[in-house]
Amino acid sequence: MAEMKTGDIRAMSDDQMDDAILNLKKERFNLRFQRATGQLEDTSRLREARRDIARIKTIAAQKRAGKTK
């Protein structure tokens, strides 16, 4: 999965964001195991997945804050 763009994330519904976070967490889990066993070739993917999760969580929080105002 390539790095997610902010515009794509903003277009997602809350349920889609939750699903994306869950998928990225699973991917990170698998990537960590691959790194530990020496099978991981693209080590930058770990960083991208971590940042994608943070990006989605940030936009979700902004959406929630906008709805409550």
Swiss-Prot record:
GO biological process: translation
InterPro entries: Ribosomal_protein_uL29, Ribosomal_uL29, Ribosomal_uL29_sf
Record key words, sorted: Ribonucleoprotein, Ribosomal protein
Any one cellular-component term (Gene Ontology): cytosolic large ribosomal subunit
One MF term in the entry's GO annotations: structural constituent of ribosome
Cited Pfam families: Ribosomal_L29 (PF00831)
Keyword check for Ribonucleoprotein: yes
Family: Belongs to the universal ribosomal protein uL29 family.
UniProt xrefs under HAMAP family: Ribosomal_uL29
Protein name: Large ribosomal subunit protein uL29
Species this chain originates from: Rhodopseudomonas palustris (strain BisB5)
Gene assigned in the entry: rpmC
